[in-house]
């Protein structure tokens, strides 16, 4: 029996591609294991920061230490960007991003000698996942690859290619309908630069969202990360028209300072971002906006950072992902002057974390007493379910049916989410843990 484990780092696009590899391997007779020792390990890596690269390297060394005879295949953005560094790790094969699509051929070609197969990214996006995602509640559909933005700090466009490649609408329709038919309750539409979907073939993300509206079923749709400049009026109207489209967007603002945004190569000003926020919140005052912010970008002053704090306070993000600036090889930002000392980055990180925590609590307090639709995904303990609502807020509540939607009413806050009860219950206390 040929057993394989796939370890995935990074974004939802990587998660989709790992699922695609798993399906191809299973078709070829391999057994894909969720845990335990395997004969083959595929590490689908990320390269968005130095820290995640370190995690990738640690995992590979850990696998090799506990399983000397395993065959280890390293793929993903780190492998694509740094093949020379990757081949110095204890791996049997280094594969580029486009090579994932032919994982079976590559794994079958292992011959005892280390192989490095990394081509220039740029192949069309035609792959389809049939739907064997582990939890059977949430699935992903990758509709786009590549990024034609010119952000000065980002290496992902170098890994994924600078040309937008969109999945044809007909292929998307088939894949989406199949996911709904198989009973997935939440379908996440993802891409490296999702908002640019269709640019290469005379279509658009708004057109794709119109396709979704016509598909009946008990499901909901969530969009993954999108850039400020791509949230146009047609996208906003789609949220207004389609109740299945989750009122949540992850919009990476990166900084609250226009000066910093300009040095980052971002294509908007904070006033543009606020217009988008206002339009979304005019549809639904609770519209959930999550974001990414980089602290310590070269040249960031105390005044710039203060503007970021003020933005977080004003927008009331439901969640903020914070990163210390990490210079990526080959990017313009890695050569910029005005570097911020690591001690100052750490200080700003800690301050922003506290601010983000405060506004998240404030956002969640506002929804106490409101009814939400939660997709139960796992048990916290016997008789207590947990999952996310349409606004991407995590709930805990008494119940016993995983993989279904539950109407709940928010009662109080938890550490990272809320405690709720079934909407038809007066009380629904969650038992204390331990």
Curated annotation (Swiss-Prot):
Q: Which residues form the Radical SAM core domain?
A: 133-362
Q: Which NCBIfam families match?
A: MiaB-like-C (TIGR01579), MiaB/RimO family radical SAM methylthiotransferase (TIGR00089)
For this chain's record, the cofactor binding note is: Binds 2 [4Fe-4S] clusters. One cluster is coordinated with 3 cysteines and an exchangeable S-adenosyl-L-methionine.
**UniProt catalytic activity:** N(6)-L-threonylcarbamoyladenosine(37) in tRNA + (sulfur carrier)-SH + AH2 + 2 S-adenosyl-L-methionine = 2-methylsulfanyl-N(6)-L-threonylcarbamoyladenosine(37) in tRNA + (sulfur carrier)-H + 5'-deoxyadenosine + L-methionine + A + S-adenosyl-L-homocysteine + 2 H(+)
Give the subcellular location. Answer: Cytoplasm
Q: What is this protein called?
A: Threonylcarbamoyladenosine tRNA methylthiotransferase MtaB
Q: Which UniProt keywords apply?
A: 4Fe-4S, Cytoplasm, Iron, Iron-sulfur, Metal-binding, S-adenosyl-L-methionine, Transferase, tRNA processing
PROSITE patterns for this protein: MTTASE_N (PS51449), MTTASE_RADICAL (PS01278), RADICAL_SAM (PS51918)
From what organism does this protein derive? Thermotoga maritima (strain ATCC 43589 / DSM 3109 / JCM 10099 / NBRC 100826 / MSB8)
Q: Which cofactors does this protein require? A: [4Fe-4S] cluster
Q: What PANTHER family does its record include?
A: RADICAL SAM PROTEINS, THREONYLCARBAMOYLADENOSINE TRNA METHYLTHIOTRANSFERASE
Q: What function is annotated for this protein? A: Catalyzes the methylthiolation of N6-threonylcarbamoyladenosine (t(6)A), leading to the formation of 2-methylthio-N6-threonylcarbamoyladenosine (ms(2)t(6)A) at position 37 in tRNAs that read codons beginning with adenine.
């Amino acid at each position: 029996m040929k057993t394989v484990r796939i370890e995935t780092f990074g974004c939802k696009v990587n998660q989709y591609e790992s699922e695609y590899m798993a399906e191809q391997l299973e078709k070829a007779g391999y057994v894909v294991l969720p845990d335990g020792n395997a004969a083959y390990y595929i590490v689908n890596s990320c390269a968005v920061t130095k820290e995640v690269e370190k995690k990738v390297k640690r995992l590979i060394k850990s696998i090799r230490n506990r399983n000397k005879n395993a065959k280890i295949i390293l793929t993903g953005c780190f492998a694509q960007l740094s093949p020379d560094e990757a081949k110095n790790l204890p791996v049997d094969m280094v594969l580029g991003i486009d090579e994932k699509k032919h994982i079976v051929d590559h794994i079958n070609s292992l011959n005892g000698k280390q192989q490095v197969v990394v081509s220039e990214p740029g192949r069309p996006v035609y792959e389809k996942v049939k739907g064997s995602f582990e939890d059977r509640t949430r699935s992903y559909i990758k509709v786009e690859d590549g990024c034609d933005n010119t952000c000065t700090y980002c290496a992902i466009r170098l890994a994924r290619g600078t040309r937008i490649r969109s999945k044809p609408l007909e292929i998307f329709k088939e894949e989406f309908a199949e996911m709904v038919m198989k009973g997935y309750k939440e379908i996440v539409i993802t891409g490296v630069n999702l908002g640019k979907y269709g640019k290469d073939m005379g279509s658009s993300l708004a057109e794709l969202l119109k396709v979704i509206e016509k598909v009946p079923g008990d499901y909901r749709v969530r969009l993954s990360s999108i850039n400020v400049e791509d949230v146009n009026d047609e996208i906003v109207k789609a949220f207004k028209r389609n109740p299945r489209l989750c009122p949540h967007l992850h919009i990476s603002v990166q900084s609250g300072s226009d000066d910093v945004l300009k040095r980052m190569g971002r294509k908007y000003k904070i006033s543009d971002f606020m217009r988008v926020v206002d339009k979304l919140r005019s549809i639904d005052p609770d519209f959930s906006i999550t974001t990414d912010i980089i602290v310590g970008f070269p040249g960031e002053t105390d005044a710039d950072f203060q503007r970021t704090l003020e933005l977080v306070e004003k927008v009331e993000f439901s969640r903020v992902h914070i990163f210390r600036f990490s210079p990526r090889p080959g990017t313009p930002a890695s050569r910029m002057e005005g570097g911020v000392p690591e001690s100052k980055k750490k200080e700003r990180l800690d301050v922003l974390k506290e601010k983000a925590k405060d506004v998240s609590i404030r956002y969640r307090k506002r929804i106490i007493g409101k009814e939400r639709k939660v997709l139960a995904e796992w048990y916290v303990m016997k008789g207590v379910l947990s999952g996310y609502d349409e606004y991407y807020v995590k709930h805990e509540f008494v119940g016993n049916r995983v993989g279904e939607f539950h109407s709940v009413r928010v009662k109080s806050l938890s550490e990272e989410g809320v405690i709720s009860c079934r909407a038809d219950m007066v009380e629904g206390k969650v038992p204390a843990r331990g």
